Every structure is written in C-alpha cells, then in structure tokens.
Amino acid sequence: MKIILVNNRFKENTEKKAQEIAGQLSALNVEVIIDNGLDEPYAGTVDFIMVLGGDGTMLRAARRYGQRAIPVLGVNMGTVGFLSNIEINELAEYLPLILREEYSLEARMMLEVAVFQQQSLLTRVFCLNELLLRSNSPRMLSFALEISGQKLEPYRGDGLIVSTTTGSTAYSLSAGGPIADPQLDAFIVTPVASHIINKRPLVVSPEREISLHLLEEREAIIGIDGQIKMDFGAENRVLIKRAPHPLLMVNLKAKPFFTSIDRSLQRQ
C-alpha cells in the first residue's frame, strides 16, 4: 500500500505529525510520500491520501490530487474542520480500518476553471470550494454572466462567487448564499454586495457552463478557494464547468452534515 501524507509546511505541528505518522506506517510496510506543497504533485500510483491540517490544507490537496480518483481522508489539526472526517487524536483508532480499506466514499463535485485572454487559454485550475470574481479597488465592478449561452442582465457590485455545494458553507454563505447539501451536484452563484437589489443567488445545474467577463476596464482579480489569486481585466474571460471527476472523500465515521453545520454556525 502506498499513501500520500499532505501537511501544511507553515504549521510546525503538522510537519512533525507527518513525520511521526510516516514512521508508524513504514513500520507496517506502507510506503509513504510526504507532500508539503513545495514540490510538484506526486505523479506515481498511490492508494490513499491522508490530509493533516485544517480546511485550507484539504482544499490544496483537492486541487493537487482531486482529479485522480484517489480516496482522500481529512484529519483535522486546525481550527476549522468542515472538510475533515476525524480528529488527529482519533487516527490511531481508525488506522486499522484505513489499512484494511474498510471505509465508505462520498463523491464531492469539483469545479474546472479556465481563464482566457481573448481566445487564448491562460490557465486551467480545478477546485473544491469556489471561484471568486471581485474588484481589486474600492470601485464597483460591472460584469456579464452567461449560463450555457443564456445572457443575464449585467451585474454591478463588488463581485460574484461561483461555488460547489461543498463551498456553499464558505465564502458564499457569508455573502448571503444558501447552505446546500454537499451530496447535491450544483453550482451556487452568489452576488457579493450587489448594487442591483433583485440579483439573488442562483442554483444552477452542473450540466451547464458558466461564463464571466467584465463590461468595463476595471482592476479585478479572480480567487480560487481563497488560495490562488490572478489578475482579471476586460480582455479576460473565465469559463466554469463541472470537473471531469469528483473528489472521493473518505468517511470512517458518521458525520451528519446538517447537524454538524448547525452546531458549528451556532458557536460562531
């Protein structure tokens, strides 16, 4: 068996814990690859990915490995663990189940984001939570949204979020978007501080494609899962669609979504 341990190199406790777990697994004849984000994603064949950290580390792991149909387990060592299934102090209890592959998988839809300059593709990124288009200055943006070729009336405001249902409890929620069942495949389109009062969040079929471009020359940026940022101008266009493969999230124990999210939000 070969396992990738993904950790956060900016947090010393996850670096140390990754080395400790790697030693334990090696003693059980498990080959271990440690990924702290410095190098390119490991390209070889692996059986399992264990993510040590919080939601940010899980989002990075999803971008790097989510399109390879490898089971991914989130082990929470951070303050926010919406995407984790177990806590670090539970790992010893559940490790035998991992090695025997006795767990269930939950498929989470991911986004495929393609950014163009005129007709040329600049970059293609996969993400689990959301794409954000927002102004990079105090001025509002004016931008166009198309859904599978259907042109909507122009938007004006601070920006727009296109999220998965997994991402519905992240930035989209704070902007007034709905909480969506993560087992549902859909796009959640949420305006950010819309200047047009009747622009409401949309729930869109994953079979559609969403296109965004600016209507004026403004300083804008695109953010991917809160971790990747790129400049976005009037000559750019972004196309969002469902990624070819979902993220396969490992469930070792029951973690009821609506009960968990309700408790988490009540504590905030």
From Swiss-Prot:
Any one cellular-component term (Gene Ontology): cytoplasm
Keywords: ATP-binding, Cytoplasm, Kinase, NAD, NADP, Nucleotide-binding, Transferase
Keyword NADP: yes
InterPro entries linked to this entry: ATP-NAD_kinase_N (IPR017438), ATP-NAD_kinase_PpnK-typ_C (IPR017437), NAD/diacylglycerol_kinase_sf (IPR016064), NADK (IPR002504)
Pfam family membership, one: NAD_kinase_C
A GO BP annotation: NADP biosynthetic process
Coiled-coil ranges from the UniProt annotation: none
Cofactor(s) needed: a divalent metal cation
UniProt-annotated binding residues for NAD(+): 55-56, 60, 129-130, 156, 158, 169-174, 193, 227
EC number(s) from the headed UniProt entry: 2.7.1.23
Reactions accelerated catalytically: NAD(+) + ATP = ADP + NADP(+) + H(+)
Location within or outside the cell: Cytoplasm
Active site per UniProt: 55 (proton acceptor)
Similarity annotation: Belongs to the NAD kinase family.
Function description: Involved in the regulation of the intracellular balance of NAD and NADP, and is a key enzyme in the biosynthesis of NADP. Catalyzes specifically the phosphorylation on 2'-hydroxyl of the adenosine moiety of NAD to yield NADP.
Protein name, as recorded: NAD kinase
Organism of provenance: Syntrophomonas wolfei subsp. wolfei (strain DSM 2245B / Goettingen)
Protein encoded by which gene: nadK
